[in-house]
Amino acid sequence: MKKFAFLITAVILSFNAFPQAEKNAEEVFLDAEYYRLYEEYEEALPLYQQLINEGFDNAHINYRIGECLLEIPGKKDNSLVYLKKAVDNINKKFKEGSFKEKGAPVYAVFYLGKAYQVNEKLDKALETYETFKEKVGDNKDNYNMDFVNKQIESCKTARELMKNPINIEEENLGQIINSPYQNIKPVVKNDESRIIFTSKLKFYDAVFMSEKKDNKWGPPQNLTPQIKSDGDLYNTSLNKEGNEMLLFKANPYNGEIYKSTREDNKWTEPHKLGKNINSKYWETHACFCEDENKIYFTSNRRGGIGGLDIYVSTYDRKNQEWGKPKNLGRQINTPYNEETPFISKDGKRIYFSSQGHKGMGGFDIFYADKIGENKWSKPVNIGYPINTTDDDLFFCPVDNGNAGYMAKYTKDGYGQKDIVRIEIFSKNNPRTISLEGSIKLDEHKKKMIPGK
């Protein structure tokens, strides 16, 4: 009888334990959702994975894991496994934010297509994007189908560009510059003796500076205390002397451009630029031109052509303020987003990132030549492998565009993203080759010259 009573008690306890386990799991889920909504994917990912390990393995959780992995450099190839599982159970009436939801939304199919594209599986990406369009069916008004079609075209463009790669040489700036985290937004002074960049550390985003001596970069100095940042300031450009820095400040509801000056070997507390640069909307990037008489910046203010547009403002020396900005026009700006403009040393070429021009996927880097006052040539895709099937957002040109600095993930790198210097070889910048010994110039004359 005692044994029978013990068994009944054990069964009752097990029934009570299950609702408690589910309640605990729901709390983990809500925490993960919170981090994901604030785009803190590295915080959200282990929580979603915990749910899988605890037995809550369903299409919904697999979808969220795949989504997170697609946003973390170095882990994007792992997203395919989870998104493939997610699309096996699509729920067209998907309940966003519900732990009880076991299915995945139709949008999971789009994410699978994106995962194939990012991982250069272009045939599978095209097939999956078409499947997504079929799944959407008559509900096209609920989805941005223009963007889906643009992704399809970008896969086709990627095929073309990957068949004809440009000639480059890539130099990783090394472990002294690159931390184990994401090292991004590299900007340099004209002679490349000073670099400033942002590193996304574990607890905050920090701005660093390094000086080059004897052709070697020194230990980076954390500028965050000098510029009095709470992790919300990000460098965007340097002037040619490297003693004035523009920064982007991320506020809860908008972004603003600030400026800091180097005085007595220290950077001043940044001050906000005037109302002609900063609006109540998002200003996300700004750069100086060579003579520092103009600032090119991005903004999604009213009256633009697309999302973020590129504008230019000229300094009014009489009134000592930046003048009213001019939109660079439809030759540069598209109905999508343009970002991170930089001007070449001679002031004749603009480099920028765009979602709207003919690219390989997401943002690509383009350049256009100045052909008149606020007039530009048709933008040219800088080419593969500088551009990839992923987002490529930041290219700081040096040597009039024959080289540049950018951040990217590399399998043999030091961090999630490393800062690299890329030399671009062309007719205007031919690759030089050093040889030792002798080479034969003419088979008939048998003339030999010493190698160099």
Language model features with spans:
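Structural motif corresponding to the intra-repeat A-B loop/turn of tetratricopeptide repeats
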Residues: 38, 72-73, 119
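Alpha-helical segment of the N-proximal tetratricopeptide repeat
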Residues: 23-50, 54
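Residue-level recognition of tetratricopeptide repeat
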Residues: 33, 67-68, 114
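Bacterial Sec-dependent N-terminal signal peptides
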Residues: 1-25
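TPR-repeat structural position
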Residues: 41, 75-76, 122
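Short, conserved micro-motifs composed of acidic
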Residues: 26-27, 58, 97-107, 111, ...
